[in-house]
C-alpha cells in the first residue's frame, strides 16, 4: 500500500497479508450508492456502480443515471467504460401459494429498507416520504411484525418484479435491460429447472 492523501493514508502492508502478483491485473472496484453525492463519487472514481436493491426503475432512470452520466463526463469516460450492476427484488414461485409467500417476504424487505432514514430519498421521489417515517416509528418501537402491512401493492410493484418464473425474465429486461450491464438475481425457492429457464430467458438477449 502506498496511498498518502490529504486526510488519511494507507501504507501499512505486513508481508503476511501482502498478496502475490496476479496475471489478471488490477481488480475492478465497484461502489454502491443510493444518494446523489455517493452516486457522483462512484461515477467519477470507480470502475462500476452497484444499484441498491431498494431502488425503483423511476429512481434509477431519473436520479442515478443522470448523475452517473455527468460523473463519467467529468472524468472524460464513456458509458461503455463503466459497468452498472443491480440485484432487484424478485417475488416468484412455482405455485400461486409460493408466489404469495415470496410477495410477503419482499414486502418485509421493502419495509425494512424503507425504515432507514438514509433511503428516504427514494420514497420521497415517489411522494411516499410519510411511509418512511411511519416505518421508522414502528422499527424504533420494535413493532417489526407490523411493518410489512404498510407496503401496499403500488409500493410493492414499484420496487419488486413479481410473477411466475417464466414472467420474471421479460419483466426484468423490460424494466432494466437498457440500464444495467449485470443483473444479480436471487429468486428463492425455485427448482433448478425453473431457475435455469429464467436464466436462459435473460441470456437469450443479444449483447448490444
Segments predicted by a language model, with ranges:
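Active-site-adjacent structural elements that line small-molecule/cofactor binding pockets in enzymes
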Residues: 1-208
